[in-house]
Amino acid sequence: KLESFIQEHGVESVAWVQMIITCNTNGGQPVSMANIRAVAEICKKYGITYVADCARCFENAYFIKEREEGYQDKDIREIAKEMFSYFDIAFMSIKKDGLVNVGGMFACRDKDLYDRAWPDNMNYEGHVTYGGLAGRDLEAIAVGLYEGSEYRYLKGRIGQVQYLGERLDEFGVPYVRPVGGNGVYIDARKFYPDIEPGHFPGLCLAADLYMKAGIRVSELGASAFSYKDEQGVIHYPEIDLVRIAISRRVYTNSHMDVIAEALGELYQSGSPNFKGMDKSDWYGATTHFTSNYTPMWK
């Protein structure tokens, strides 16, 4: 598919190829080393820059170790090192696999690109040696990256996400299978089949779940990924997901039980509080974060 796209549209129309490991918008699914390597070969063939969004790179390395032949006996950091060997650029929100509350990272192989990038960082964030972060945050990042790449930690974290999936199975709750690394993604349209995408079934589920059990989740569907074309026609994604992201080192399996039971009751009742949501504001590219919605009460 990738090579066909490049051949159809031309190399000059492709600024770069970006791989998200793991992918936050499709259920937190991992990318195999074979896939990463194959895309690298295509990018090299056509001279296209290969970029990694690697916020959850250690979770991805864990799945490679668990599932991909030839990696069972390799260390998480060793696997991560091989992953990064295929990319030209990597950027990371360190708040994810770095286990901290602030910080990010940009790395590249091209010295010229680096020399052009870091002055902007200094203008907007801080000097390249600290990026506007306090010393304590830099120390936390150093520790977090080390602990976040420990196999025992990853096994426990991802095991908790898998436990939530197993509990949801008991209630027949529909979600993206298999569960990924950072959370469980619920199929909102199967909760509310009568609510059209334009009335945001994912947001309705998020609101219902919060009112029922005080559980806060994120919609990744019509609100996040719909867009207006040049003619003003709104296009909606094929699925409406609600992400139940599991915070690191915070919850016990008892909390997972509460989530599963609340979702199970909502799914089995088949009676949402809403007929849908109306978007009262539209803010273009940032709409998912900044728009306001009005509930259409039953």
Kindly give the residue locations of the regions a language model identified.
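Short, conserved charged micro-motifs
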Residues: 115, 193-201, 249-258
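Conserved PLP-enzyme active-site core in the AAT-like
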Residues: 1-173, 196
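Generic non-transmembrane alpha-helical segments
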Residues: 38, 42-45, 163, 167-171, ...
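PLP-dependent enzyme catalytic core of the Aspartate aminotransferase-like
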Residues: 148, 212, 224-298
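Conserved glycine-rich beta-strand-loop-beta hairpin in the small C-terminal domain of fold type I
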Residues: 161-162, 176-188
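Active-site loop ensemble at the mouth of alpha/beta enzyme cores that anchors a bound cofactor
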Residues: 161, 189-216, 230-237
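Short, glycine-/Ser/Thr-/acidic-enriched flexible segments
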Residues: 24, 96-97, 110-113, 146-148, ...
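Flexible glycine/proline-rich, aromatic-decorated loop/lid segments
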Residues: 108-116, 136, 211-238
